[in-house]
Structures are given as structure tokens and as C-alpha cells.
């Protein structure tokens, strides 16, 4: 693999002139934070946000950019080849951040074909269109879960992929598609594998907002299995900073681990949140825990080394103490941001809410109307 320092001339070239950046899944959690950072860091660049407005996305995530002239929202499906081809033909995209994905692991066991369709087939549609359009960089967001788990050995970018659930399998398949364009065409791709990301505005199917929502409703934190499985947690601002750094100076054709310094067992995570949210004593912590049936397959750990990112100059800046404080505060102040609905109804409810918000969003009339 190439030395990241070899891409320094490319950094200068990238910063010349205005660019048009496409973010797929931009109304979702990480995508919306990324768009906001790009808008601040590169105020003259155009940002095109393509999102299908699935249940875990919301136009509220980017309400602050509604009246920004350089920002365009377009509703559409990345699996729709006609839509994507038309998008690249009409929008003059320079850089792609592919964040769109089905990512809820439990759902992947129920709907494995849907996960493979969106995460792998959708990526292939994007790759073909981006390649034909000659974009400058295609940055694909993958996951540490493609490695499978490990109790002791830390994974680096050369470690073999051993995905253990339909979600991580679909992401590994998409990675292979992305890398094949580099191997065959030298198409300028970069792949990232990140730890669990958390922070404000994350939908409550993920563990931290899920626990916070349950505690706000005076319900117990539901823990799958023993709760001894641990995760590394990375604050959302740190992942978006890493993505921009890779856009600016990442080596083409490379994979980058974006790992967190902080690891915690899920049972301990729940206890920490109970202590803060419910102001509980140590003797009361476990009264707020409810152990439920585990996933069909549950990985214990995803330990990664991020030396390649560190050599580029990136390291996490937001400590766990500060990040979780900000996150708890946001959810306490935004209790009705995400509607509280049962799992079976969440898709329909969120899509209905997004439909109403869509009428207020700023869209590009010449293109968006045909995409809706």
C-alpha cells in the first residue's frame, strides 16, 4: 500500500477552486454532521445531499442550512440507476462521500436481502455513475464490523475481513466493489472503517440514544445477552473531521481505520447513563437494567489500530466524558425530536414526518421535482 505522504501534492490541487460535493445519506446522523462541517469549512463549495428519507433520517437534521444557497437537497434512492445517472450528469459532482446505508444490525437478520440490495447494489450503482462522470474522489464509509470480533488482537487495515452478520457482510461486499474500481481502473477511491459513532441527533435504534430514550420514559435499559460485549465509541465531530482530512490528503486506493480511544462494556455504559439521567446511587443502578435475548450472533469486541490516520495528523479530540455529556444534554433538551413509536410503526411514521418537512426544504426545482 502506498505511503499517505505521497498524496501531499494532491492536497494542494484539491483546494484550488470551488468543488461540488455529493453526500449520500446526508439527512442521516453522520451525513448531516458531515454536511454541516463541509458548509463551515468550505463555504463556497456546493453541497448536494441525496437521501431517500428512510425512517432514521430527518430533514430537521439540516434545518439550519435550508436557506443556504450552496446547499441542495434531493430526495432519491441510490439503487435507482436512472436517478443516479441523471444526478451525476446534471450536478457536475467532484467529490463523493458515500454515507447512505442500512445499518441496524438487528434488522439485518430480519431483512438480509434488503441490506445487501441497499448497501452493496446501491454502492455499485453509485460507483458506475461516479466512474463515468470522472469524479476526483469517492470516499466510502464502511465499518469496523467487517473484521469480525477479537478478544485480544487489534485489527489493522490488512487484517482479513470476517463479517458475522448480514449488515457487516453487505458492507464487506460493498468494500470489495469499491476496491475493484481502484484495482481495475485506478478510480480514486478511499475506504474508511470506523468505530461506533455517537452524538446529538442520532436515531434511537443505536445503543446510546436508545438507552437515553428509555430512561427518559422511566423504562429500563434493555441489554442483549450478558452486556459484557464492549464497543469503542467515537464522537461524531471526530469522524467528520477524519473524513475531511481524508478528502484533503488521504492516499487513493487505501483503507483507513478510524478508531476511538475509549472502550466500554455495554452493561457499564448502561450503568453510567442510569447514574447521570436518573441520579441513581450505585446500589440502584442495576434496578434500571433489563436483560433480554441476545442477537443470533454477537461480536464481543472490535479492537482496531488507527496508525495510518494518526500519521495523517488525525486523532480523536473529544473525550468520552465531554462527548457523552454533550450527548446527554442534547437528548434531554430535545425529547420530542424523534417520535416515540413502536418498531413496527417507525418506518411509516418517520416517512410521513419527512414528507411534511420536505415541502419546507430548499430543493433544486429543475432536478428535485423529477426525483420525488
Predicted regions and their residues:
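A short, amphipathic alpha-helix embedded in the catalytic core of nucleotide-handling enzymes
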Residues: 38, 181, 210-214, 242-246
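N-terminal Rossmann-like NAD(P)+-binding domain of SDR-like oxidoreductases, especially those catalyzing
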Residues: 1-197, 237, 326, 332-372
Amino acid at each position: 500500500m502506498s505511503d499517505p505522504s505521497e498524496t501531499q501534492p494532491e492536497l494542494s490541487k484539491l483546494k484550488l477552486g470551488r468543488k461540488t460535493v455529493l453526500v449520500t445519506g446526508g439527512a442521516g446522523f453522520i451525513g448531516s454532521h458531515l454536511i454541516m462541517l463541509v458548509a463551515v469549512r468550505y463555504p463556497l463549495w456546493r453541497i448536494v445531499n441525496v437521501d431517500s428519507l428512510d425512517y432514521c433520517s430527518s430533514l430537521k437534521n439540516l434545518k439550519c442550512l435550508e436557506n443556504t444557497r450552496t446547499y441542495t437537497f434531493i430526495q432519491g434512492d441510490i439503487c435507482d440507476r436512472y436517478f443516479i445517472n441523471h444526478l451525476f450528469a446534471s450536478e457536475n459532482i467532484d467529490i463523493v462521500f458515500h454515507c447512505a446505508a442500512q445499518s441496524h444490525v438487528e434488522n439485518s437478520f430480519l431483512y438480509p436481502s434488503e441490506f445487501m440490495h441497499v448497501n452493496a447494489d446501491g454502492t455499485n450503482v453509485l460507483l458506475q455513475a461516479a466512474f463515468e462522470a470522472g469524479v476526483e474522489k469517492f470516499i466510502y464509509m464502511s465499518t469496523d464490523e467487517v473484521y469480525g470480533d477479537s478478544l485480544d488482537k487489534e485489527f489493522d487495515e490488512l487484517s482479513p475481513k470476517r463479517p458475522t452478520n448480514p449488515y457487516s457482510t453487505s458492507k464487506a461486499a460493498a468494500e470489495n466493489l469499491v476496491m475493484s474500481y481502484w484495482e481495475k481502473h485506478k478510480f480514486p477511491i478511499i475506504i474508511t472503517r470506523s468505530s461506533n459513532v455517537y452524538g446529538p441527533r442520532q436515531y434511537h435504534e443505536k445503543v446510546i440514544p436508545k438507552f437515553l430514550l428509555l430512561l427518559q420514559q422511566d423504562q429500563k435499559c434493555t441489554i442483549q445477552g450478558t452486556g459484557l460485549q464492549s464497543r469503542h465509541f467515537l464522537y461524531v465531530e471526530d469522524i467528520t473531521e477524519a473524513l475531511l482530512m481524508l478528502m484533503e490528503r488521504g492516499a487513493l486506493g487505501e483503507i483507513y481505520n478510524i478508531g476511538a480511544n475509549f472502550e466500554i462494556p455495554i452493561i457499564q455504559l448502561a450503568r453510567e447513563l442510569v447514574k447521570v439521567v436518573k441520579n441513581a446511587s450505585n446500589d440502584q443502578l442495576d434496578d434500571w437494567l433489563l436483560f433480554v435475548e441476545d442477537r443470533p450472533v454477537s461480536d464481543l469486541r472490535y479492537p482496531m489500530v488507527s496508525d495510518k490516520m494518526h500519521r495523517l495528523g488525525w486523532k480523536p479530540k473529544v473525550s468520552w466524558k465531554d462527548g457523552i455529556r454533550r450527548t446527554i444534554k442534547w437528548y434531554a433538551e430535545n425529547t420530542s425530536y424523534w417520535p416515540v413509536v413502536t418498531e413496527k410503526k417507525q418506518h411509516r411514521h418517520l416517512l410521513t414526518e419527512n414528507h411534511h418537512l420536505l415541502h419546507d426544504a430548499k430543493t433544486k426545482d429543475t432536478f428535485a421535482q423529477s426525483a420525488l
